[in-house]
Design a protein with these regions (language model features):
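Ligand-binding clamshell of periplasmic/extracellular solute-binding protein-like
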Residues: 119, 136-151
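Short helices/loops that flank or line small-molecule/ion binding pockets
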Residues: 2-3, 99-108, 122-136
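Extracytoplasmic/peripheral linker and loop segments enriched in polar/acidic and small residues
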Residues: 6, 18, 111-124, 152-211
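Append "and occasionally in soluble cytosolic enzymes with long acidic Gly/Pro-rich linkers
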Residues: 1-103, 195
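Extracytoplasmic/secreted cell-surface and envelope-processing proteins
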Residues: 93-96, 123-125, 148-151
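Loop/turn elements at helix/coil->beta-strand transitions in domains of secreted/extracellular proteins
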Residues: 1-5, 13-17, 80-82, 107-112, ...
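Short, solvent-exposed loop/beta-turn-alpha elements that line the ligand-binding surface or hinge
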Residues: 1, 38-57, 67-81, 127-134, ...
């Protein structure tokens, strides 16, 4: 449900996290494309700025409401909504960030619990993600980029690193345009990448946090 995913993104005050936990060395990202790729990065792309009221509104409109008064929202059918979150074990700042994520989500009425109750050692984390562990609903990860921002290597239908396993005809069509000879035209290439960045924001199958 894109409304649920967007709500989870709007609930996070990642700019504050970057300032307080990383001494201002990391900042909130507005796009799945990083500013390093200045030719195609869209600085005007709408991002998920901290907006808990908007997050609550999205959940209300989508039918995720607190029907029993315990402060936590239920599924649309009234059943308990519990979301399992997986995150890597890293440094002390990351541990604090993970706990803050859980708190921010609780503030908008979402019951999000850590998978196994704690963060996961790096290799085990990726083993579970690659194995499509059915108990993991959401995960926090990161990646490095080369010198080509083409998204097919991360989000293509058969991409090895498409850990989100999210594929739909619209996204596939945009990626094909980015990889087409038509994209040799600089203006077209910029247009296609802007389309991709907006698509990722709207679907929110992945949402960027810190860069």
């Amino acid at each position: 449900d894109p409304n649920l995913r967007q709500a989870m993104a709007y609930a996070l005050d990642v700019e504050a996290a970057g300032q307080n936990l990383y001494n201002g060395l990391q900042h909130a990202s507005n796009s799945i494309i990083i500013p390093f790729f200045k030719d195609v990065y869209n600085k005007d792309q709408e991002g998920f700025t901290y907006n808990p009221e908007k997050a609550k509104q999205l959940l209300d409109e989508a039918g995720y409401k607190d029907v029993d008064g315990d402060g936590l929202r239920e599924n649309k059918d009234g059943s308990k909504l519990k979301i399992t979150f997986a995150a890597r074990t890293r440094d002390e700042a990351n541990e604090s960030l993970v706990q803050q994520y859980l708190n921010w989500w609780k503030e908008i009425g979402l019951d999000v619990q850590l998978y196994t109750g704690r963060t996961i050692e790096l290799n085990s984390f990726y083993d579970k993600i690659q194995a499509d562990d059915s108990e993991i609903d959401v995960f926090a990860a990161g990646w490095s980029t080369g010198y080509d921002p083409n998204p097919e290597g991360l989000f293509g239908e058969t991409a090895k690193f498409n850990f989100e396993r999210y594929v739909d005809p619209e996204g596939t069509a945009i990626m094909k345009k980015i990889s087409s000879t038509e994209a040799f035209d600089s203006a077209k290439n910029i247009e296609f990448y802007k389309e991709w960045q907006k698509y990722v924001h709207d679907k929110a199958f992945i949402f960027p946090t810190l860069v």
